[in-house]
From Swiss-Prot:
Keywords assigned by UniProt, alphabetized: Cell cycle, Cell division, Cell inner membrane, Cell membrane, Cell shape, Cell wall biogenesis/degradation, Magnesium, Membrane, Metal-binding, Peptidoglycan synthesis, Transferase, Transmembrane, Transmembrane helix
Cofactor: Mg(2+)
Gene for this chain: mraY
Tagged with keyword Transcription: no
Record-given protein name: Phospho-N-acetylmuramoyl-pentapeptide-transferase
GO biological process: cell division; cell wall organization; peptidoglycan biosynthetic process; regulation of cell shape
Molecular function via GO: metal ion binding; phospho-N-acetylmuramoyl-pentapeptide-transferase activity; UDP-N-acetylmuramoyl-L-alanyl-D-glutamyl-meso-2,6-diaminopimelyl-D-alanyl-D-alanine:undecaprenyl-phosphate transferase activity
Organism: Campylobacter concisus (strain 13826)
Similarity comment text for this entry: Belongs to the glycosyltransferase 4 family. MraY subfamily.
Length: 354
């Protein structure tokens, strides 16, 4: 809307991505802060609380009546802010909206199965969830490939030249990145605010890369790939950051609401999408370091138990390991936030080390 005000009335300030990103941030934040208490009241009335896994640490049992599916609210507000502030004729914006909406709906279906439906903590079967994740991600990747909006060259962090051209195999690689990121954030969402803040850091870093890659002068100076149109996705990322900060107001310890799969699956998928859109698929390992560590802890735990019949951690994901060791929840959360911040600062050095 704001961009078209610029086109119609020649109100120049609205042509700038940074201005519209800032407006999107505040719209999403204010809307989330306004709507979330109403959603919490509704969720409590409907008993839409997160079922607690019976083997979870005992400290989690007191969270049994905490409402979930907060992701429905903050993704909704991010989408509204995007529609108001972004250019809707931009392929990356349209793909972003598709990513957020579809993964949120998938997460909602999973949450519904857990809470309002079957009343079990498992929700959708792992096979069903994974199938739909791959389907949505494949459609996203295929759109990027067919539209020619994104080249298929493979880049490594801190190296300015592409390594090789993936050609049509880029579709499958991009699909895998989006699904992996979606599940990684989902696994991390186990403590109050643990997934939200690292997600904000990741989106900030990816937003910086998107803005530079979409800018002809900056991308040339910093030796980043020039990706026409990707800068507009900064508006979407900014809207999602604003909505996540509004959500964090109610999700910080002790949480009044959880994001649920409707939030974690969509936020993770969008982080993966932004990594793909900015050619930072491998750098995502550093940008989303906390998510990677959480996921690896689960993979190692399952693999070790199946092969050696022994567990590496007291419980996986790894944040539960520290809980059982006696760390206070707040201490785990803040330390993980610090690690996430440092990892993103390191990732940003890739702007100069090329």
């Amino acid at each position: 809307m704001f961009y078209y005000i610029y086109e119609i009335l020649n109100f120049n300030i609205f042509q700038y991505i940074t201005v519209r990103a800032g407006i999107a941030f505040f719209i999403a934040f204010i809307l989330t802060a306004y709507l979330m208490p109403k959603f919490i009241a509704w969720a409590k009335a409907k008993n839409a609380a997160q079922p607690i896994y019976e083997l979870a640490p005992q400290t989690h049992q007191k969270k049994a009546k905490t409402p979930t599916m907060g992701g429905l609210v903050f993704v909704f507000t991010a989408v509204i802010a995007t529609i108001i502030c972004a250019r809707l004729d931009n392929a990356f914006v349209l793909a972003s909206l598709f990513c957020l909406v579809c993964f949120t709906l998938l997460g909602y279906k999973d949450d519904y199965s857990k809470i309002l439906g079957a009343k079990n903590h498992a929700g959708l079967s792992p096979k069903a969830k994974l199938f739909f994740q791959f389907l949505i991600a494949f459609l996203l990747a295929a759109f990027l490939y067919i539209s020619k909006e994104l080249n298929t060259e493979f880049y490594l962090p801190f190296y300015k030249q592409p390594i090789f051209d993936m050609k049509i195999f880029a579709i499958f690689f991009w699909t895998l990145v989006i699904v992996a990121a979606s599940n990684a954030v989902n696994l991390t969402d186990g403590l109050d605010g643990l997934a939200a803040v690292p997600s904000i850091f990741s989106l900030l870093t990816l937003g910086v890369f998107a803005y530079i890659c979409g800018h002809a002068v900056f991308s040339s100076y910093l030796l980043l790939p020039k990706i026409a149109g990707v800068g507009e996705s900064v508006v979407v990322a900014s809207a999602l950051i604003g909505s996540l900060m509004g959500f964090l107001w109610f999700n910080c310890h002790p949480a009044e609401v959880f994001m649920g799969d409707s939030g974690s699956l969509s936020v993770g998928a969008y982080i993966g999408f932004m990594g793909v859109a900015t050619k930072n698929e491998i750098l995502l390992i550093i940008i989303g370091l906390i998510f990677v560590v959480e996921t690896l802890s689960v993979i190692l735990q399952v693999g070790s138990f199946k092969i050696f019949k022994r567990r590496i951690f007291l419980m996986a994901p790894i944040h539960h390991h520290f809980e059982i060791k006696g760390w206070a929840e707040n201490k785990i959360i803040v330390r993980f936030w610090i690690i996430a911040l440092l990892a993103n600062l390191i990732a940003l050095t890739a702007l100069k080390i090329r």
